[in-house]
From Swiss-Prot:
Biological role stated in the UniProt entry: Starch-debranching enzyme involved in amylopectin biosynthesis in endosperm. Functions by removing excess branches or improper branches that interfere with the formation of double helices of the cluster chains of amylopectin and crystallization of starch. Works together with ISA1 as heterooligomer. The heterooligomer ISA1 and ISA2 possesses higher affinity than the ISA1 homooligomer for various branched polyglucans in vitro, but no marked differences exist in chain preferences for debranching of amylopectin and phytoglycogen between these forms.
Family, per entry: Belongs to the glycosyl hydrolase 13 family.
Transit peptide: 1-34
Pro residues: compositionally biased ranges: 1-10
Protein name: Isoamylase 2, chloroplastic
Enzyme class at the top of the EC tree: hydrolase
Catalyses which reaction(s): Hydrolysis of (1->6)-alpha-D-glucosidic branch linkages in glycogen, amylopectin and their beta-limit dextrins
Primary site of residence: plastid
UniProt record, GO biological process: amylopectin biosynthetic process; starch biosynthetic process; starch catabolic process
Keyword match GTP-binding: no
Region (Disordered): 1-22
Source organism superkingdom: Eukaryota
Chloroplast is among the record's keywords: yes
Amino acid sequence: MASLPAPPTPLGSCPRGRGGGRVVARPRRAGLACAARSCYRFRTDDDGVVDVAVSGEDGDGGGGGYAVSVEVPGTRGREGGLVLRASGSGEGVPLAPAAGGASLAAELSFDPTRAPFYLSFLLTDASGAEIRTHRKTSFRVPVGVGPGSPAPLGMSISGDGAVNFAVYSKNANAVSLYLYAAAVGGGGGDEPALEIDLDPYIHRTGNVWHVSLASVDGYVSYAFCCGGIRRPLLDPYAKVIGDFVSSNSVYDEGVTAPSMRCFASLAIAPSYNWGRDRHPRLPLEKLVVYRANVALFTKDRSSGLPDDAAGTFTGLSAKVEHFRSLGVNAILLEPVFPFHQVKGPYFPYHFFSPMNLYSSKGLSVSAIKSMKDMVRVMHRNGIEVLLEVVFTHTAEGESECQTISMRGIDNSSYYIANGIAGCKASILNCNHPVTQKLILDSLRHWVLDFHVDGFCFINAPFLVRGPGGEYLSRPPLLEAITFDPVLSMTKIIADPWSPLDISNVQFPFPHWKRWAEVNTRFSIDVRKFLKREALISDLATRLCGSGDLFSTRGPAFSFNHVSRNSGLSLVDLVSFSNDDLLSESSWNCGEEGPSENSAVLQTRLRQIRNFLFILFVSLGVPVLNMGDECGHSAAGSVSYKDRGPLNWRGMKTTFVKEVTGFISFLTALRSRRGDIFQRREFLKLENIHWYGSDLCEPGWDDPTSNFLCMHINAEVDEMAADSVRGDLYICFNANEESVSAALPALAEGSVWLRLVDTSLAFPGFFATESNPKVQQVPGLSSYHVEAHTCVLFESKSALA
C-alpha cells in the first residue's frame, strides 16, 4: 500500500498540530490484530454513504499503531473507482473492491507517536469530481481519540494507559478539549497545539462531556472550552495545575480588566510513601489549636530558614518544635487552595490542589509533596492538621476575562445566578447536586490523599442557603458531609466569619451533634468583661462552655478564641481603641498606640495574661492566633491585608519568653486537670459555686459588678485509686481597684495553693503545684486580688 502523508487537522480552526508535524499513513503489516474500534458513518453529497472504522493495532512486533478502514458500500456509479485524498496532500490512495465486490475499501496505518490527531480526507471519482459529506465538508475522523467515560470527573488514567477527560456542563452546547505543548506564559503562546471538539452524540452522557486519548505524549497541559467561546477554562477537578497568569492574549481582545487564566497540568503527582503515618485522632476536648498562615508564619528572614523554605509548607515543618513548646496539638491553616493574590486566601480559584507558592520550587507537584511532608511531620509529633476551607464563593469575576473555570463551564449550575443581595462576589450554589458533589469530592481528596484531619468551614451561614439565597433547615451539603463515611471520621467546624462582608455573627447551625463551631460570643463577652462593659453572668456562661449555644452537644464543640486573623491581634487588642474600633470591644489601657508610660505598659501586659488565662481555663477548645504568643502587631489595623509576616527575632525577648512560658504552663494545666478543663460534657451544677468578694452571691444583674469567683469541686472517680484531685478556686477582677477575696473553707489538713496571679512579676506570676516556692493560703482567709487581675488556686493536702 502506498504511503499517504496526512497532516493533523484539528477541529476548531487550530492553526497547527503538535509542533507543526505531519501524520504519515503506512501500509498495514500482516499479522496485526485490531483492538477496540470506533465506527463512523457519513452521508455524502451524492446521497451515498461512507463508513470509517478506527482501530488500535497490537502487533507481535510490539510497535502498535492505528488502522483506519474506509469503506464505500455499493459500486453502482463508481465503476471507475474512487481515490482517497487526505487534506493537505496531493497524493491519494485508491479504494479497491472489497471481498464479494459489494463495496470499495482502503485501509491505512498510522504511526502511534502522532496520536491523537484528526484525519481529514475527500474522495474523488474517475472524473476527478470531489465527493464530500452532505454538509459539503471533508470527512473527518479522530485517531487515538475514544468516546471516554463520564466517571470520574477530571483527568484520569485507565488501565491500558489511555487518558480520560470528563467535565460536567449541563448548559454548554459545545465542548472542546485543548491540549498545549508549552506551559502558559512560558513563551510558547497561549494557543493550543491541538483542539478536539467533542461530539454530543459520542462524547456526552447525561450532562457529562468526556473523551479518551490513547496518548498525551508531547503535551504538557490542558483546558476545556465551553459554549463556543474561545477561552480556555481550568478543569475544576484538576489535581495538578499551573500558575494563575495575568496576561491578555488573542482570547481577550478589547478587554479592559486584567485577564486571568490557569491550565491544568497533564503531569501526575508521584505516589507518596506515607510509611507508618496515622491520623492522631485526638478527642475534641483535648485539642489546643494554633491558627497560622503558611506564608506569613516563616516568610520573614528572621525565621532563620533558607529562602526556598521560608513561607512554605517546608518552613511550617521546620518550626514544629515551636508548636510543641507551646503545648499545641493541632494547627489550623488558613486556606491553602490556589487563591487570588490580591484579595487573599479567602478568595479561592480551585479546590483540588495546594497553592504552588507554598512550595520551594513554586510548582504544583512540588507543593503537593511539600504539603504531604508537612502533614507527616506534624502527625509524627502528635499534631493534627486542620484546614480552613472556603466553599461559598470563588475569586472568579463577572467579566469574561475573569472567567477562569466553573463560571465558563456551567455558570447556572455552579453559581447562584444573581448572587445574594448586598454581596458582589461569585456565590457558589453549594446545595446544587453538582456543586455539592464537587465539594464532597474535594474534601475526600484532602483526607484520603493528604491525610488532613479536619476542616473549618469559613462563612458557614452561606452553606445553609438554597439557590435563591433562602435558608434551608436541612441543607443537603451539610447533611452529606455529616454522614459521609470518610468525612465523618474527621473534625468538622463551622465558622460564621464571612470574608465577603467581614460579618461575624453566631447563628443557629444545623449540627446533627457532629459539627463544632467557632464561638464568636466567647470573644465578645471576654473582651467586654475585661473592658468592664459586660454582665458577669455572660463571663460565667463562657467559662462553663457556652451552654446557651452548645447545650445539646457539649462544651468540646465550642472553639474559643480571644483574637483572630480578621481583627485586632492580641497585643493590639490592649493597645488601640479609637472610634473606628468600636466593634472590636478593645481597650488601650489608658493611651492610644505605642506607649512608654510604665503604668500603661504594665496594665497591657496584665491584660494579655488575663485574656490567655480566661481562654485556657474555659471549657471548650482554645484557639491561639498566629503571633499572639510574640506580640505580633498590625498597628491597630483590623484589615486582613495589613498583616505582616511573623518576626522571629522577638522570640528572644523577655516579653515573649514570659508569654510563651505562660501558654506552655496553661496547656500543661489543662492536660493535668483534664477532669475539669477537657470535658466532653458540661460540669455538674452541684460542683460549681459562684461567689462575690466575700463568698456572697455575685451581682449577676449589676452592670457595675466586675468581680467574680468560681469554685469548682473536683469529681472523684471511684474506679481509680489515685483519683483524688483538688478543688479549684478562680478569681476574676476587671475593676480599676483591688478586691479582698475570701477563700472557701477546706477540709482539715488542706490548703489553697496559688498557681496563678496575673498581677505579679515574671518569673513568679505562675507556678506548678509541685513548685516548693508556691504560696500556700489557708481556707477562710482572704487574698488581695489586684486591679485587672486573675488568680487561680488549687486545693491540696498540706501533708502531701
